[in-house]
Amino acid sequence: MSGSCSSRKCFSVPATSLCSTEVSCGGPICLPSSCQSQTWQLVTCQDSCGSSSCGPQCRQPSCPVSSCAQPLCCDPVICEPSCSVSSGCQPVCCEATTCEPSCSVSNCYQPVCFEATICEPSCSVSNCCQPVCFEATVCEPSCSVSSCAQPVCCEPAICEPSCSVSSCCQPVGSEATSCQPVLCVPTSCQPVLCKSSCCQPVVCEPSCCSAVCTLPSSCQPVVCEPSCCQPVCPTPTCSVTSSCQAVCCDPSPCEPSCSESSICQPATCVALVCEPVCLRPVCCVQSSCEPPSVPSTCQEPSCCVSSICQPICSEPSPCSPAVCVSSPCQPTCYVVKRCPSVCPEPVSCPSTSCRPLSCSPGSSASAICRPTCPRTFYIPSSSKRPCSATISYRPVSRPICRPICSGLLTYRQPYMTSISYRPACYRPCYSILRRPACVTSYSCRPVYFRPSCTESDSCKRDCKKSTSSQLDCVDTTPCKVDVSEEAPCQPTEAKPISPTTREAAAAQPAASKPANC
């Protein structure tokens, strides 16, 4: 090589070509400043670089891979890129290679090369085409240098994606660290068309567990995300023919366990949004207020209910929601809501294996089923008490404090009671929400009188449903009665009313006024 680069009389070879018409064969050539310390091979060009006279003497890149943006050639081959120098596409060619990109020249910014090429695609989403290479192409990762390892060559693939840029410019390879996202691409050179429904590639995100990447099936994505080192679905149990199919696994405590979807969920391991109380699912019990809309899919429940996660059961109707319980032991909090007036009949707790066996309606504690925190439960109604037509009833206000564990109560409507303490059997009183501490019940006591109305006009009475502020027996058809002087229809002497029964007694003025007999 004649001349000297220090004379400033030689041409500077562009990075896009090794053989140019601006430099005559045998003239001085200035090597790029970044690679002057390396050994370069200069080949004599013939016929204006139209033919090759050298044998294939390809060597490894003479500069580091991290900064290898300089050309490396053996035979004089001109490979003109289809993008500008500012876009970072600098081809490196060896031997005769056809520069035919997979898309139009105006839309493709990646050349076709034999050796490794570092390029940064600058095309848009609709025009992002993968390069067609003979062996391999290394692309600059789309993430920062600190989070990506050294680029690794991979087999080429022709893909016309319809997805975003993030799936077109991902680092490829298998030598990935725990902090490097890896894109698993098909190893065949056959065209792989990504459909719009499955355009996302297989991406392994960093996690505290070792994530395993598998090749997708028919462009189906499989996303591996961190799962707190304990994946919800460790191994597929339904089907192992394809990694994209669903697998059977125990549902997460943070997800509903009684849904209409199939038991086999997609094989996607996601991070738990909350710490589960227990890892086994609980069961949903349909309310008896309305017929169940979906068949019961009760599984083996656990002995605890997650209270910090999402609701396990959704309310099927505003009448009465489904009750989430567990067996064979008691949950942390056991709540049963009362039915509003929309329900035609009083609601009784359904008896099913998914509920505690010893918790019967109307009872809140027993030797096995004893609550440890506030709860609500139903008090079922009893049958109507018949009223006699020849006997009048005078209301007498008296508080009734029944033991909690003394069997069924005789109220006509389902009350929702609340125990704000750990109840023990046979406590003296219980409370009703929005009611006094002790429920005031009215009983009908016969009062002697002599009716003068005929048998056809006799007093007809009917028992209506009672509440804590209503009478058990109410006249439906008042009639005129001749009260004898011996036993007139007089009000009974007013008795002192405790503060507990003051609300109910105020609603019944019969204790201070004569009865309309």
From Swiss-Prot:
Sequence repeats lie at residues 73-77, 93-97, 128-132, 153-157, 168-172, 198-202, 208-212, 228-232, 248-252, 283-287, 303-307. Residues 73-307 are annotated as: 11 X 5 AA repeats of C-C-X(3). One of its GO terms (cellular component) is cytosol. Residues 504-517 have a biased composition (Low complexity). One of its GO terms (molecular function) is structural molecule activity. Residues 483-517 are annotated as: Disordered. Keywords: Keratin, Repeat. Pfam families: Keratin_B2_2. InterPro entries: KAP, Keratin_matx. PANTHER family: KERATIN ASSOCIATED PROTEIN 3-3-RELATED (PTHR23260), KERATIN-ASSOCIATED PROTEIN 26-1 (PTHR23260:SF7). Belongs to the KRTAP type 16 family. This is Keratin-associated protein 16-1. It comes from Homo sapiens (Human). The lineage of its organism: Eukaryota, Metazoa, Chordata, Craniata, Vertebrata. The gene is KRTAP16-1.
